[in-house]
Structures are given as structure tokens and as C-alpha cells.
Amino acid sequence: GTASDGLRTTDNFDMFSGAPDRYNWELKGRKEMLVPYNAYALHAKGVAYDDIIKPGHLNADYLRYEKHRVYVVEATLKEGISNIYSKRVFYIDEDSWNIVAIDMYDSRGDYWRLAESHGINYYDVPVYYNTVDAVYDLQSGRYTAIGFKNNEDMIKFGQDFSASDFTPDRLRRAGRR
């Protein structure tokens, strides 16, 4: 993805936003495992980003993991398709249907990266949605984290848009806030 120094791909947005037809998909089953969940401390207003972002990993004092049932879905890159990940294993929360973690493998089949989606319940919407997504490169020891919302304006879920909201002039004005 842009602005991630190569640590994240565009199709990693919201954990996975790629073309599903590029992979062979297989439901491996369902299991219980510890996954990021109810990350209210990470989402708390006023917590400085410098307190959360630490060398090598997010500050564990702000993270929460819970035992949840997840569906394990394996996506193997189809022959002739190009992507830096030859395989991804998705862990999809049984309750929210959110992808809460992904194991990603390089072209040699080696375990390369781990993605975690730290979410919370937005009870007034209602929806369970990420507050921070992190991608850890296990080979380089680097990581990137995006989507911090605790010191930003609240997401406007369900906002109505029209085609005129996406004209070059309107987008230019929106970018100057």
C-alpha cells in the first residue's frame, strides 16, 4: 500500500480488499484461538500515538486478545497470477464476520507477515469494526499500523453520498480541511 514503505499491499486495506478470483479458496474449518478483540484501550480518546507505537510492535499495554471461534480460510494464489503473497490464511471471527488475523506467505512458501485487526463494537451503529490494523514483517522485524481513530473525528457510518461528492473539484476541496 502507499505510504507504508512496502510493508502493506493495496489489497491489505481493511485486511483484504483484493480480487477474490486471483486465489483458490478453501475453508479449512473452525477453531478457537486468541485473537485481537474489544480493543477499547487502544481506541481510548487522548492516548498519544507515541505511547501506542513502539519499536517492533504495538504497545501490549493497549492490546486485548480474547478466545474466539474463527473460521480458517486458506487462499492460495492461482497459477499465472502475480502477487507478493503466494498464500494467505484468514482467521474470520464467527460472531462479527470480520477478518481478525491473516498469516501471509512469500513466493517460496515461507511465513512472512502477520496482520491483526484490533476492533471494537460501535454500539450506536451497530457494527464491530477495526480501530487499528497492524501488519508485522516477521523477516525484517518491521511493522506498520494504520487506521488509528482515537484522536480523530468519529467515523460517519451510513453517510449518504452522491456522484457530485466525487468530482475532482469536490475532492480537491475535501482534501484542504
Question: Which residue ranges define each predicted feature?
Answer:
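Flexible, processing/modification-adjacent segments and terminal tails
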Residues: G1-R69, G80, F161-R177
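Gly/Pro-enriched, hydrophobic low-complexity segments
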Residues: G1-P20, L58, E66-Q159
